[in-house]
């Protein structure tokens, strides 16, 4: 029985074949994607299979994603198929080693139509960890569903982990910072990168955990994980955290990166795997999470086979 539930989007990424702009690209490579999907797959690869609540269309792209998740060891109990909506698509541009840019086709697609209550209370009673991201908050149906899930998980003393992932192109007129503020009181731990924090209303030096963590603690989470790319990652927790008040930093690992897409998701999976496994030293948690993230970058694709994280240490 899984002790972790991950919830959110899965989609198909299309990457240009060759170094050409999207407007002039004739051929694309198809890959499975979506931050929560990447987290669920990485957890399975770390021998901690998680339930994954998502929704894809009853179309060939949905078939591709459902088959990929199953092949990667993700239990299919909460992988829903929508007969009335298509699967989300994203076209990726930019340098994969420095950070991708996305053009989304997501209006009314299946993952925006998550419905409250589809994960029953008995499933939440069975898990100890719930991981959600911010992308579902951009769409009204999914927003209600994720809020409901987080509130019920919080009421059952599950540890709720929130991946703060700013995608301005998805939000339109919806208030990103406001939606983040609404969900944070029910969140225990938040993971973010500096570029996510400004749009979420965090002020000051967003590369400095001592500057950003107090602002996030005030909003609810007792633990903050800040990823810093090649510089590593930092963490800070208050006395309300099960691991006590602490600060930690780890400088990361130098690897020959092929593709950094999904590195942050691998980091999240590493954090959850370490904490769910009983680790309470945040320095050790960061060491493990950075190793998982580094290992994930040496092969192309956010769901590619994961080398042994110990191999990069």
PLM features: what roles do these ranges have?
Residues 10, 135, 266:
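Active-site metal-binding loops of divalent metal-dependent hydrolases
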Residues 43, 193, 264:
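Short, conserved phosphate/pyrophosphate- and ester-handling motifs at nucleotide-, phospho-/glycolipid
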Residues 129, 134-215, 219-223, 229-233, ...:
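Conserved beta-alpha-beta core of the PfkB/ribokinase-like small-molecule kinase fold
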């Amino acid at each position: 029985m899984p002790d972790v539930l991950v919830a959110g989007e899965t989609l198909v990424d299309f990457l240009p074949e060759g170094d050409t702009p999207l407007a002039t690209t004739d051929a694309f490579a198809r890959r499975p994607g979506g931050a929560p999907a990447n987290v669920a797959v990485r957890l399975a690869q770390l021998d901690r299979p998680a339930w994954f609540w998502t929704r894809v269309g009853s179309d060939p792209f949905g078939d591709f994603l459902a088959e990929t998740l199953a092949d990667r060891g993700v239990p299919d109990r909460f992988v829903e198929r929508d007969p009335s909506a298509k699967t989300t698509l994203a076209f990726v541009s930019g340098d994969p080693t420095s950070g991708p840019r996305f053009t989304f086709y997501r209006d009314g697609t299946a993952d925006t139509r998550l419905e409250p209550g589809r994960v029953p209370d008995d499933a939440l009673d069975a898990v100890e960890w719930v991981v959600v991201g911010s992308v579902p908050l951009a769409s009204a149906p999914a927003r209600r569903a994720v809020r409901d899930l987080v509130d019920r998980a919080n009421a059952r003393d599950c540890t709720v982990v929130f991946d703060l992932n700013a995608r301005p192109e998805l939000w339109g007129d919806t208030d990103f910072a406001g939606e983040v503020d609404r969900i944070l009181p029910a969140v225990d731990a938040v993971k973010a990168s500096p570029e996510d924090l400004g749009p979420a209303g965090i002020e000051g030096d967003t590369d400095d955990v001592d500057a950003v963590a107090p602002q996030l603690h005030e909003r609810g989470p007792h633990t903050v994980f800040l990823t810093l790319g090649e510089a590593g990652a930092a963490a800070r927790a208050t006395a309300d955290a099960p691991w006590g008040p602490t600060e930690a930093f780890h400088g990361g690992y130098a690897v020959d990166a092929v593709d950094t897409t999904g590195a942050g998701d691998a980091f999240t999976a590493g954090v959850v795997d370490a904490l769910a496994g009983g680790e309470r030293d945040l320095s050790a948690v960061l060491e493990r999470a950075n190793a998982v993230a580094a290992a994930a970058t040496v092969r192309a694709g956010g769901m590619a086979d994961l080398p042994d994280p110990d191999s990069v240490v």
